[in-house]
């Protein structure tokens, strides 16, 4: 091995961390995930590379009040999902209250960041979008492979993320939409960035998250929405 070759946890002469950049690039090639904050909740959406006839592969419950959608290496994602659930349960058992969204994102972000600096490790190749509540208001947060945590109105990771994020920022109305309207608009935006017709209904996972209800849209309901959009 070339001892002069930069290790995965050291900076290059240009001040870059190549392995972190590679991990972020890997996420940008994975199945698309989108989150959007609405007047009555948060929409989480995931696009699978192949049809899914079994359990959800993109959207997961982390606690009674926090759900997530993930993008990147599946094994890495399952490890971080397990870690997040454990930390959320630890907070509940120790303090008797649900783990706040910001706190859980901090825990996951710190774990991700630690793997960018320890020798013999590599970054987690996965990004998460989290739906929850902050100070009584619906919120969408993220953690990326570097461990950075952010709060968003709308955000996308994965394939076609640049075009979709541009659309979320520039094409969506400033006024808040309800989850039903936002779901249709997100599907329209997704359809502009990639092929998306009724035959892709079984590749989509959609969650409507609110304080009172967490609803996974069944495939036949997603199919109906895509047929209506495709007909216009």
Swiss-Prot record:
One of its GO terms (biological process) is proteolysis involved in protein catabolic process. GO terms for cellular component: cytoplasm; nucleus; proteasome core complex, alpha-subunit complex. The 26S proteasome consists of a 20S proteasome core and two 19S regulatory subunits. The 20S proteasome core is composed of 28 subunits that are arranged in four stacked rings, resulting in a barrel-shaped structure. The two end rings are each formed by seven alpha subunits, and the two central rings are each formed by seven beta subunits. The catalytic chamber with the active sites is on the inside of the barrel. PROSITE patterns: PROTEASOME_ALPHA_2 (PS51475). Belongs to the peptidase T1A family. Pfam families: Proteasome (PF00227). The proteasome degrades poly-ubiquitinated proteins in the cytoplasm and in the nucleus. It is essential for the regulated turnover of proteins and for the removal of misfolded proteins. The proteasome is a multicatalytic proteinase complex that is characterized by its ability to cleave peptides with Arg, Phe, Tyr, Leu, and Glu adjacent to the leaving group at neutral or slightly basic pH. It has an ATP-dependent proteolytic activity. It is found in: Cytoplasm; Nucleus. This is Probable proteasome subunit alpha type-3. Keywords: Cytoplasm, Nucleus, Proteasome. InterPro entries: Ntn_hydrolases_N, Proteasome_alpha, Proteasome_alpha-type, Proteasome_sua/b. The keyword Repeat does not apply. Transmembrane segments: none annotated.
């Amino acid at each position: 091995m070339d001892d002069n070759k930069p290790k995965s946890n050291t900076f290059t002469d240009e001040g870059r961390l190549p392995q972190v950049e590679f991990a972020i690039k890997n996420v940008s090639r994975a199945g698309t995930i989108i989150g959007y904050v609405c007047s009555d909740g948060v929409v989480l959406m995931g696009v699978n590379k192949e049809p899914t006839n079994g359990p959800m592969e993109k959207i997961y419950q982390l606690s009674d009040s926090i759900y997530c959608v993930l993008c990147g290496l599946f094994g890495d994602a399952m490890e971080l999902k397990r870690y997040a659930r454990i930390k959320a349960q630890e907070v509940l058992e120790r303090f008797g209250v649900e783990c706040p969204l910001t706190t859980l994102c901090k825990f996951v972000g710190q774990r991700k960041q630690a793997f960018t600096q320890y020798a013999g490790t590599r970054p987690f190749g996965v990004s998460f979008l989290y739906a929850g509540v902050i100070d009584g208001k619906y919120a969408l947060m993220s953690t990326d492979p570097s461990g950075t945590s952010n709060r968003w109105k709308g955000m996308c990771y994965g394939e076609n993320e640049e075009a979709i994020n541009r659309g979320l920022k520039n094409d969506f109305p400033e006024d808040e939409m309800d989850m039903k309207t936002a779901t249709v608009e997100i599907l329209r935006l997704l359809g502009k960035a990639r092929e998306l017709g009724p035959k892709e209904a079984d590749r989509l996972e959609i969650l409507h998250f609110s304080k009172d209800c967490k609803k996974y849209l069944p495939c036949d309901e997603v199919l109906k929405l895509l047929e209506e959009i495709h007909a216009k």
